[in-house]
Amino acid sequence: MNYGQIALEKHAEWKGKIEITARAAVDSAEALSIAYTPGVAAPCLEIQKNPEKSYELTRRWNTVAVVTDGTAVLGLGDIGPEAGMPVMEGKCVLFKAFGDVDAFPLCVRTHDVDEIVRTVSLLAGSFGGINLEDIAAPRCFEIERKLKECCDIPIFHDDQHGTAVITLAGLMNALKVVGKKIEDVKIVTSGAGAAGIAIIKLLMAMGLKNVVMTDRRGAIYEGREGLNPVKEEMAKITNFNREAGTLADVIKGADVFIGVSAPGTLTQDMVRSMAKDPIIFACANPTPEIFPDEAKAEGAAVVSTGRSDFPNQINNVLCFPGLFRGALDVRASDINDAMKIASAKALAALVSDEELCAEYILPKAFDPRVKDAVAKAAAQAARESGVARI
């Protein structure tokens, strides 16, 4: 099936995948006077006295902005804000379908970090949360950090944290399958961009101790020449044995491989050199670092990819709709590690001990339990960690 051609035809037919639907009927002079002037002045004045009332008297409580500069759209690269619109509209559809969250695309015509931060911060009063999307590394880290400092609503870069949450959920169950613990295993990652770094940070928050990151030049370690500031930071908290060399060198004896890099990065020889019953998360899309049958032929116990046509898909739609649903429900000021970890645990728990096996470590995207399970866990973690406001 030619999905590209079909998508072109359907997008031309749809003329946009989202639209505004009015909740207030304006079918009489009286109704008009309530929804607009003169009646609308009363809620305006209430919000003026207490801006928090904007959550009760407008749709702000359920709205999220999906913000991009179009610099890292899917695998297409820097295609610009207008070309990124179909993806952002699609993201908004997923927010609504899987989380009942009203999301709106904001595609900005600048690559300047401070301009993006200023633009989004000025618009923050209209939204209950901000989802950053398809912004290239390392700028995405700075943009997220600065927005978190100046905004009092959740700022969430899904390419980083959504991927990290699903990876953690899948890894928790994969480790159960092979009978290993996160604090005991050695993990080697390929890809030191937004997703790769966020995955490692969240896994370390869960107790991971032994992890080696690799990029195109090989292992990342403290003192390696040519590291950007973000990789320098990661070098200080990972690879404590200062392992050097290529991916093939450092993966020997590793228990887990996590790839968010490029097709074909992991070879069968590398899998063969890993510890017994290795776990392989090959998440490059659409072509993984290694195909499941190739990895299993060399002894891989559990294999996960980013594709829906293989078992154990790492799919962000399992995370961001429910996580934002929970954050919005308690009017959270942030989405923190506690909420991410709680969401991952909730996802992992949807796979029962009886169901858990090498071919089934994560619930399916269309599992109707996902939204409520993640939302409830995220909301509770927000309350316990002090970022909930209701």
Where are these regions (language model features)?
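Solvent-exposed alpha-helices and their adjacent loops that cap or buttress functional pockets
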Residues: 12, 55-60, 96-97, 122-124, ...
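Glycine-rich phosphate/diphosphate-binding loop of Rossmann-like nucleotide-binding domains
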Residues: 74, 79-99, 157, 161, ...
